[in-house]
C-alpha cells in the first residue's frame, strides 16, 4: 500500500476528527488504547482524558516525528496495521478512517484481535458510501455511483474501497469478530469543503452548535450519516 501523507487541513475536517475521537472515547473501555493510523497525532492526545495508557501506531515515520514532538505522555510506534507485532495487549483498539485505505482490511482486523485483551473492544470508523452527500452527488451526476471511488479519493486520499454498514459488518465477521454495536456519526448535508467555508464565515460558537445539531440529527439515521462505526469484541 502506498502511504499518502495527508492530514486534515480545513477547520471543518478538524471538527469532524474531534467528533470521531469523542465517539471512540464513548465506546471504548478499560485503561489502555491503541490508536491505529494516528497520523501526526492531531487527535490522539484527546484519549488521555479517558485512558491511562495511550499508544499511537502509524506507517509514516514523517507523521510520527511530528506526533512525538507534541506530547511525551504518548508512545508513538511505526508499523503497518496488517502486520504490526507488539508485546502488549490493549483494552481498546481504535481505527478511525483507516479500513478504506489498507490492502487487506480483514487481515488488519484479525491482527487487532491478537492485540486485544479478553473482554476488550475494537472500534472501527469509516466513511459511509451510502451517505446523503454521496447519494445527492449521484443524482447530480457528480459521482458515478455510491460505491465509485473518484480519482481524488484514490490518488489523493488513498482510498481503496467504500463501505456501507452491511459491508463493514461483513468484514468484521470475516475476521471472526463479534459485532456488539453499530451506528452512524454526523448527518452531513453538504461536502466538507463547502461546510468548512460556511463554518468559517459563521464563527466557532455557531459551528459548535451546528456540529452538535448534525450529530444529534444523525443519531436516528445511521444509514444517512457521513461516517459509520462498529464496536467489536
Q: Where would I find each of the regions flagged by the language model?
A:
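A generic structural signal for alpha->beta connector loops
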Residues: 51, 73, 119, 176-179
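Basic phosphate/pyrophosphate-binding loop/patch that engages nucleotide-derived ligands
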Residues: 114
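Active-site micro-motifs of SAM-dependent methyltransferase domains
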Residues: 83, 100, 131
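S-adenosyl-L-methionine-dependent methyltransferase catalytic module, highlighting the catalytic core
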Residues: 103-111, 121-231
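Generic enzyme active-site microenvironment
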Residues: 33, 56, 98, 123-126
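Flexible loop residues that form catalytic
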Residues: 41, 98, 185-187
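A short SAM/SAH-binding and catalytic strip from SAM-dependent methyltransferases
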Residues: 92-103
Amino acid at each position: 500500500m502506498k502511504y499518502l501523507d495527508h492530514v486534515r487541513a480545513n477547520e471543518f475536517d478538524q471538527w469532524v476528527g474531534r467528533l470521531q475521537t469523542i465517539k471512540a472515547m464513548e465506546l471504548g473501555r478499560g485503561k489502555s488504547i491503541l490508536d491505529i493510523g494516528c497520523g501526526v497525532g492531531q487527535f490522539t492526545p484527546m484519549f488521555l482524558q479517558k485512558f491511562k495508557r495511550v499508544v499511537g501506531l502509524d506507517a509514516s515515520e514523517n507523521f510520527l516525528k511530528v506526533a512525538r514532538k507534541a506530547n511525551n505522555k504518548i508512545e508513538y510506534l511505526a508499523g503497518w496495521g496488517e502486520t504490526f507485532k507488539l508485546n502488549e495487549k490493549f483494552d481498546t483498539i481504535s481505527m478511525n478512517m483507516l479500513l478504506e485505505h489498507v490492502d487487506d482490511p480483514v487481515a488488519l482486523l484479525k491482527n487487532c484481535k491478537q492485540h486485544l485483551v479478553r473482554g476488550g473492544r475494537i472500534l472501527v470508523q469509516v466513511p459511509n458510501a451510502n451517505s446523503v452527500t454521496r447519494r445527492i452527488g449521484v443524482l447530480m451526476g457528480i459521482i458515478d455511483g455510491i460505491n465509485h471511488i473518484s480519482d481524488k479519493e484514490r490518488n489523493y486520499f488513498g482510498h481503496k474501497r467504500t463501505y456501507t454498514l452491511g459491508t463493514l459488518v461483513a468484514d468484521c465477521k470475516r475476521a471472526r469478530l463479534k459485532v456488539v454495536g453499530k451506528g452512524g456519526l454526523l448527518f452531513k448535508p453538504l461536502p466538507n469543503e463547502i461546510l468548512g467555508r460556511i463554518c468559517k464565515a459563521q464563527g466557532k460558537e455557531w459551528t459548535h452548535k451546528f456540529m452538535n445539531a448534525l450529530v444529534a440529527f444523525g443519531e436516528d439515521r445511521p444509514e444517512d450519516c457521513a461516517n459509520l462505526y462498529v464496536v467489536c469484541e
